[in-house]
């Protein structure tokens, strides 16, 4: 267990392990996803980025250390025509899918207007591995759908990408 590594000396010296680097990024603008098209999700609003591990122009997390990190992401989608029947949210590591969440309805007669998906996973990585989040939406009418954000500093973080170091 990790707790056995915290000693009396480390507590009295004030030197405790920290779970940084870490970051939290959210969507800063609405994003359109075309029907049945794998799309990289754009999280350009860095709420915090301790250690400079997130690039808000490539939307990539590169840990900068070898070890383990906890990674999570959330996606909230909207289709005004209420025609979603599939929503996928994926985590890619070095351009290969490693996590897949899928919400599918068995009949095209069963559709929704709004859909939320998320994942939370602990991964082992090298310092130069990189992670990205992708999504795929399917609609009955083959139309595009939106990933919507709020406005200003009061925006709700429905669309986000987050990671922090796991202390071992």
Task: Identify the residue ranges that each predicted region occupies.
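Short, low-complexity N-terminal tether/leader segments at secretion or assembly junctions of large
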Residues: 1-17, 164
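Extracellular jelly-roll beta-sandwich "head" domains, especially the C-terminal globular C1q domain
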Residues: 16-168
């Amino acid at each position: 267990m990790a707790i056995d590594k915290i000693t009396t000396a480390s507590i009295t010296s004030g030197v405790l392990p920290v779970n940084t680097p870490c970051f939290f990024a959210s969507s800063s603008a609405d994003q359109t996803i075309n029907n049945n098209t794998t799309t990289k999700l754009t999280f350009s609003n860095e709420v915090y980025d301790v250690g400079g591990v997130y690039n808000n122009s490539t939307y990539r997390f590169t840990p900068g250390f070898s070890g383990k990190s906890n990674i999570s992401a959330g996606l909230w989608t909207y289709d005004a025509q209420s025609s979603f029947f599939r929503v996928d949210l994926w985590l890619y590591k070095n351009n290969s899918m490693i996590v897949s969440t899928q919400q599918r309805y068995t009949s095209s007669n069963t559709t929704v207007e709004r859909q939320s998906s998320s994942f939370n996973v602990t991964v082992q990585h090298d310092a130069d591995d990189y992670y990205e989040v992708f999504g795929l939406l399917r609609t009955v009418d083959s139309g595009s759908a939106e990933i919507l954000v709020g406005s200003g500093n009061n925006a709700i973080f429905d669309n986000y990408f987050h990671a922090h170091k796991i202390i071992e």
